[in-house]
C-alpha cells in the first residue's frame, strides 16, 4: 500500500467518526410508506417537561426535515470507502425500462479507468452504470405525465409532511400566522398524487439520476418547502478528495438539500465519484468546467463532441442535475459591454468567448435537443444556467439578463416536450426593490418551472459578509416563489470556502429558507418556532439549544459567560442578568395574578400598581427617605 493510500485511509477514518455524531437529544426516525422499502428519515428532537412553576406539562417531540442521510443514524455503520447503502435500485429494476451497461461508455471515463496511476485515488467500488432501454424515457416527469406515482413520489410526500397529520391532531398547527404566498398553491397536506401533478406540470422537479441509487428522494418546487444548495469543489490552487468529501458530509449535516460539485482542479472525475457514492442528496455539476479542463483551459478549443462525452461520463457516474448555459446567445454578448462587471458567470464567460471566437451560435443551444436525449436516458435534470446574471447591483435586471431569461423559457418548453425535468437558475446581485420583478418575470417566461437563485446579494459593499447580503435577498425571493436558494459563504468573491465557511453559509440559508416558508404560510412551518419560544419562556435552556439550527454554537455562546451546569436551569442569561429578565418578570406577574385570583395579567399589573401606591401612602408619602 502506497503512502498516499495510507494517508487517504487515515483521513477517511477520521471523517467516519466525525460524520456519524447524532445531534444532541435527537434521534433518527423512519416513517414508512405503502411498502417496507420506503423508509423516510426525519429527525425527532425530544423535549423536557415544562417545569411545575410554569404549569407542568409534557412537551411533545418536534420532527424536523433531515438531510444528513445515514450519517447521523447510530444503527448504520458508515464506511466512506464503500459508500452509502442502496436506496433506489429495487424501484428502478421494477420499472423494467433500464439496462445495465457492460461498462463505462464515455471515452474519458474509460481512459480514467484504464490509468493505473490513479489507483491510489480511485473509489474502489466503481459501479456498472445503467441507462434507459432503447426508445425508453426514465425521467420522473415522464412517469408523472403517464399518471404513475413512483416510490420516489410517495417518499417525497411523506418527507414533506413530516407527520403533519399528528401535529394537526395535537393542535400544534393552531398557532401559525396566515401567510402570503403570491399565487403559490400550497395544500394543507402533501399527497403522492399532488407530487405527481406538480412534476407532470413542470412546477417541481425530482433530481434523481438512475445511477445515483444512494439518493434519498427530494423535490424542488414553489409549492413545497424552500430548499437550499451548498457548493463544494476543488480548484487549481488547492483542496483534495478527502477535503471535498468532508465538505459534503459537513454540508448535509447542517441542512444542504442538494450539493453542487464545482471542481475545476485536479482529478475532477475521481473526486466526483467519491462524492456521489457518499451522498444521500442530489449532486449537481457544471459540465462545461470539466470539458474546459479537457482542452487545457482554452475555450475556443471546446467542441460539441467533447461536451457530449462529458455529459455521458457524468450521467453514468450518477450526477442528478447539470447546469448548462444554453441561453448565452451570440446576440446577447454585446449587451454586456457597458456593464459595470460584465459577464461574471464562469460558464457564461466560457460560452461567450467560444461564440465570439467562432462567430457562431452557442453549441449548447444548437444541440439542445440532443442534450435532452441524453438527459432522459439517465433522468438527469436541467438546471438552465444564467450565464449573463448580474455581478453587481448596478447591472441588475438589464437587457442581457432578461434576454437570456426569455431564451431559457424557450428551452424549458423544448425540454418538457422530451419529458425532461427543468429548473431555472437566477441572479446574482439585485437590490431589494428589484427582486420581485425577477421572480415575476421568471414565472412568466418559464411557465412556473422552479427558480433556483444565487442569493441574490442585495448590496456590494460587504466583502467577507456576503452570506448576510445574500441571505437578505434569498429570504425575500424565497417568499416570492423561488424554489431553491444557492448558498453564499463569507468567502464569496474572496477565496475557496473551507469547512467552517460551508457551515456558516448553510446555516445562513437555512434561516432564509425557513423565513420564506413562514411567510408563505407553509403548513407546520411554525411548529419549531413555537416550541423554541415556549422553551425560551420556560428557561429550558437545553431545549432552546437543541431546537435551534446550530445547537453547538448556541450552547457555546451561552457558556462563554455562564459555563456552569447550574446556569442551564437559571431563569436568566448574561444579557439582562437575574433582575432585568423580561420573561422572568412576566412570569412573576402571572404568578401574582394566580396567587391573588386575578383572571388576566393586565388586572394583576393594575393590582400591583395599587398595592405599591397604598404602601407609598402608608410610609408617609415621602419621595426621598434617609437610609
Swiss-Prot record:
One Pfam family per UniProt: ThiC_Rad_SAM
Residue ranges of the region described as Disordered: 1-29
Source organism superkingdom: Bacteria
EC id: 4.1.99.17
Gene Ontology molecular function: 4 iron, 4 sulfur cluster binding; carbon-carbon lyase activity; zinc ion binding
Binding-site positions, substrate: 231, 260, 289, 325, 345-347, 386-389, 425, 452
Cofactor dependence: [4Fe-4S] cluster
Positions of Zn(2+) binding: 429, 493
GO cellular component terms, semicolon-separated: cytosol
UniProt remark on cofactor binding: Binds 1 [4Fe-4S] cluster per subunit. The cluster is coordinated with 3 cysteines and an exchangeable S-adenosyl-L-methionine.
Keywords: 4Fe-4S, Iron, Iron-sulfur, Lyase, Metal-binding, S-adenosyl-L-methionine, Thiamine biosynthesis, Zinc
Catalyses which reaction(s): 5-amino-1-(5-phospho-beta-D-ribosyl)imidazole + S-adenosyl-L-methionine = 4-amino-2-methyl-5-(phosphooxymethyl)pyrimidine + CO + 5'-deoxyadenosine + formate + L-methionine + 3 H(+)
Ranges of compositional bias, category Polar residues: 1-24
GO biological process, one term: thiamine biosynthetic process
Keyword DNA repair part of the UniProt annotation: no
Keyword Zinc: yes
Known pathway: Cofactor biosynthesis; thiamine diphosphate biosynthesis
Positions contributing to [4Fe-4S] cluster binding: 573, 576, 581
Subunit field text: Homodimer.
Family: Belongs to the ThiC family.
Function: Catalyzes the synthesis of the hydroxymethylpyrimidine phosphate (HMP-P) moiety of thiamine from aminoimidazole ribotide (AIR) in a radical S-adenosyl-L-methionine (SAM)-dependent reaction.
Protein name: Phosphomethylpyrimidine synthase
Originating organism: Pseudomonas aeruginosa (strain ATCC 15692 / DSM 22644 / CIP 104116 / JCM 14847 / LMG 12228 / 1C / PRS 101 / PAO1)
Gene giving rise to this polypeptide: thiC
Amino acid at each position: 500500500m502506497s503512502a498516499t493510500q495510507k494517508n487517504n485511509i487515515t483521513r477517511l477514518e477520521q471523517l467516519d467518526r466525525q460524520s456519524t455524531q447524532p445531534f444532541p437529544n435527537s434521534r433518527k426516525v423512519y416513517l414508512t410508506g405503502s411498502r417496507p422499502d420506503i423508509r423516510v428519515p426525519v429527525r425527532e428532537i425530544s423535549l423536557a417537561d415544562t417545569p411545575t412553576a410554569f404549569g407542568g406539562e409534557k412537551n411533545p417531540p418536534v420532527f424536523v426535515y433531515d438531510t444528513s442521510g445515514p450519517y447521523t443514524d447510530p444503527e448504520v455503520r458508515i464506511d466512506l470507502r464503500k459508500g452509502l447503502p442502496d436506496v433506489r435500485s429495487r424501484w428502478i429494476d421494477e420499472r423494467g425500462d433500464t439496462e445495465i451497461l457492460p461498462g463505462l461508455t464515455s471515452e474519458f471515463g474509460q481512459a480514467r479507468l484504464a490509468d493505473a496511476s490513479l489507483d491510489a485515488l480511485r473509489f474502489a467500488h466503481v459501479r456498472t452504470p445503467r441507462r434507459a432501454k432503447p426508445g425508453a424515457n426514465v425521467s420522473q416527469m415522464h412517469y408523472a405525465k403517464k399518471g404513475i406515482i413512483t416510490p420516489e413520489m410517495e417518499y417525497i410526500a411523506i418527507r414533506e409532511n413530516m407527520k403533519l397529520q399528528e401535529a394537526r391532531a395535537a393542535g400544534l398547527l393552531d398557532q401559525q400566522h396566515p401567510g402570503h404566498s403570491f399565487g403559490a398553491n400550497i395544500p394543507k397536506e402533501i399527497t403522492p398524487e399532488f407530487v405527481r401533478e406538480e412534476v407532470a406540470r413542470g412546477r417541481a422537479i425530482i433530481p434523481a439520476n438512475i445511477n445515483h441509487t444512494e439518493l434519498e428522494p427530494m423535490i424542488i418546487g414553489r409549492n413545497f418547502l424552500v430548499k437550499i444548495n451548498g457548493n463544494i469543489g476543488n480548484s487549481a490552487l488547492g483542496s483534495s478528495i478527502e477535503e471535498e468529501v468532508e465538505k459534503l458530509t459537513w454540508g448535509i449535516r447542517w441542512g444542504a438539500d442538494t450539493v453542487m460539485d464545482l471542481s475545476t482542479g485536479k482529478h475532477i472525475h475521481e473526486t466526483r465519484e467519491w462524492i456521489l457514492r457518499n451522498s444521500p442528496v442530489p449532486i449537481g455539476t457544471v459540465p462545461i468546467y470539466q470539458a474546459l479542463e479537457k482542452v487545457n483551459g482554452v475555450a475556443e478549443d471546446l467542441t460539441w463532441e467533447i461536451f457530449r462525452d462529458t455529459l455521458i461520463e457524468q450521467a453514468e457516474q450518477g450526477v442528478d442535475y447539470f447546469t448548462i448555459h444554453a441561453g448565452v446567445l451570440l446576440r446577447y454578448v454585446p449587451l454586456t459591454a457597458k456593464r459595470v462587471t460584465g459577464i461574471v458567470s464562469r460558464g457564461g464567460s466560457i460560452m461567450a468567448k467560444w461564440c465570439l471566437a467562432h462567430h457562431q451560435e452557442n453549441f449548447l443551444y444548437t444541440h439542445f435537443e440532443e442534450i435532452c436525449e441524453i438527459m432522459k436516458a439517465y433522468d438527469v435534470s436541467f438546471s438552465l444556467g444564467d450565464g449573463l446574471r448580474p455581478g453587481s447591483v448596478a447591472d441588475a435586471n438589464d437587457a442581457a439578463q432578461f434576454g437570456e431569461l426569455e431564451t431559457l423559457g424557450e428551452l424549458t418548453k423544448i425540454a418538457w416536450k422530451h419529458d425532461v425535468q427543468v429548473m431555472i437558475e437566477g441572479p446574482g446581485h439585485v437590490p431589494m426593490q428589484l427582486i420581485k420583478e425577477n421572480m415575476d418575470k421568471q414565472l412568466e417566461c418559464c411557465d412556473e418551472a422552479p427558480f433556483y437563485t444565487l442569493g441574490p446579494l442585495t448590496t456590494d459593499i460587504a466583502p467577507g459578509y456576503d452570506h448576510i447580503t445574500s441571505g437578505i435577498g434569498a429570504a425575500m425571493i424565497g417568499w416570492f416563489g423561488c424554489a431553491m436558494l444557492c448558498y453564499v459563504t463569507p468567502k464569496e468573491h474572496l477565496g475557496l470556502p473551507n469547512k467552517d465557511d460551508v457551515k456558516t453559509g448553510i446555516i445562513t440559508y437555512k434561516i432564509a429558507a425557513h423565513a420564506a416558508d413562514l411567510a408563505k404560510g407553509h403548513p407546520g412551518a411554525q411548529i419549531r418556532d413555537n416550541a423554541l419560544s415556549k422553551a425560551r419562556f420556560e428557561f429550558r435552556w437545553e431545549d432552546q439549544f437543541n431546537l435551534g439550527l446550530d445547537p453547538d454554537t448556541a450552547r457555546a455562546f451561552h457558556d462563554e459567560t455562564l459555563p456552569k451546569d447550574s446556569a442551564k436551569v437559571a431563569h436568566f442569561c448574561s444579557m439582562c442578568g437575574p433582575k432585568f429578565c423580561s420573561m422572568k418578570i412576566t412570569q412573576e406577574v402571572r404568578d401574582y395574578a394566580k396567587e391573588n385570583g386575578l383572571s388576566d395579567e393586565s388586572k394583576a399589573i393594575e393590582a400591583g400598581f395599587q398595592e405599591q401606591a397604598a404602601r407609598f401612602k402608608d410610609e408617609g408619602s415621602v419621595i426621598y427617605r434617609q437610609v
